[in-house]
């Protein structure tokens, strides 16, 4: 085959992926809302018909009216801000420590030998069961609540980051080394992209564990927070306020998870995962 013949050969045509139909995406969003809406409608109907006693489980409309009243007088906003502050501090402390130790254990042999064994032993202990000991160590004030959130967030991030680093194909690292990439470049272009999917999964699990820990922490000698609001309402049999607190926690967890998933999609644009059909 001559040179001109090669030059005139047409380039192979690579089919572009079919664009997703906006109408299909919109329809799927409506389907995702169908089951929660149906559940709320059934709950409202059962409460209004008397199948559910109001003192046991008030109607959603009653809970929303209570929420509007507490939001209007500033009560809900004050307690919500305190809960968000505790959750943010705990996530920052627990997540930062998990990132540092997970990276050390995943990247360094010495770090694996020194860090991973005690962490593996500590994860067998239910951190919520450590409340009596934590009260002795850090007191019964704000430190206890932040520590519980930090412990809840630490383990999911640590183990997913550790597993994400260890699951990277070593041949990719060797290929990068052969191409002349230094340690920092290999970390940036090979290790970090390979570990990010697992890290985002760990973040999503950590968010859930953090809110669960905060629910418990705010019921131990708290003076503010959504958990305190629920405990105070329980003393006066205000079931609507208790259910409102649970709803606030659920919405906070959902909003946090959606935020992490959005950041994951924006960060991992190169990753094509399996889509549900």
Regions found by a protein language model. Name each.
Residues 1-37, 258-277:
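Transmembrane alpha-helical segments of polytopic membrane transport and secretion proteins
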Residues 109, 166, 201, 243-277:
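C-terminal transmembrane helix and the adjacent membrane-cytosol boundary/short C-terminal tail
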Residues 19-25, 49-93:
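Periplasmic/extracellular loop-to-transmembrane helix junction in inner-membrane transport proteins
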Residues 117, 160, 164-205, 226, ...:
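Short cytoplasmic-facing helical segments at TM-TM junctions of multi-pass membrane proteins
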Residues 89-119:
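Transmembrane-helix boundary motif in ABC transporter permease subunits
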Residues 76-80, 84, 114-122, 161, ...:
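Hydrophobic alpha-helical elements at and bordering transmembrane segments
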Residues 147, 151, 183-217, 240, ...:
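Transmembrane alpha-helices
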């Amino acid at each position: 085959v001559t040179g001109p013949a090669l030059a005139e050969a047409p380039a192979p045509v690579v089919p572009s992926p079919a664009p997703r139909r906006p109408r299909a995406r919109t329809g799927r969003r409506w389907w995702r809302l169908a089951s929660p809406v149906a559940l709320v409608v059934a709950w409202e109907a059962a409460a209004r018909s008397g199948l559910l006693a109001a003192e046991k489980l008030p109607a959603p409309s009653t809970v929303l009216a209570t929420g509007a009243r507490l939001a209007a007088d500033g009560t809900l906003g004050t307690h919500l801000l305190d809960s968000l502050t505790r959750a943010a501090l705990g996530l920052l402390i627990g997540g930062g420590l998990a990132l540092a130790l997970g990276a050390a254990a995943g990247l360094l042999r010495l770090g694996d030998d020194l860090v991973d064994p005690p962490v593996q032993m500590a994860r067998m202990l239910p951190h919520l069961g450590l409340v009596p000991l934590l009260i002795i160590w850090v007191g019964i004030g704000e430190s206890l609540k932040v520590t519980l959130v930090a412990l809840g967030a630490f383990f999911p991030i640590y183990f997913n980051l550790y597993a994400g680093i260890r699951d990277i194909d070593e041949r990719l690292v060797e290929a990068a080394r052969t191409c002349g990439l230094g340690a920092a470049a290999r970390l940036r272009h090979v290790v970090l992209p390979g570990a990010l999917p697992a890290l985002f999964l760990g973040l999503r699990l950590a968010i859930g564990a953090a809110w669960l820990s905060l629910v418990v922490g705010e019921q131990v000698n708290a003076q503010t927070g959504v958990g305190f609001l629920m405990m105070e309402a329980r003393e006066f049999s205000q079931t609507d306020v208790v259910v409102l607190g649970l709803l606030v926690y659920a919405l906070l967890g959902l909003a946090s998870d959606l935020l992490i998933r959005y950041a994951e999609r924006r960060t991992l644009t190169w990753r094509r995962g399996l889509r549900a059909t």
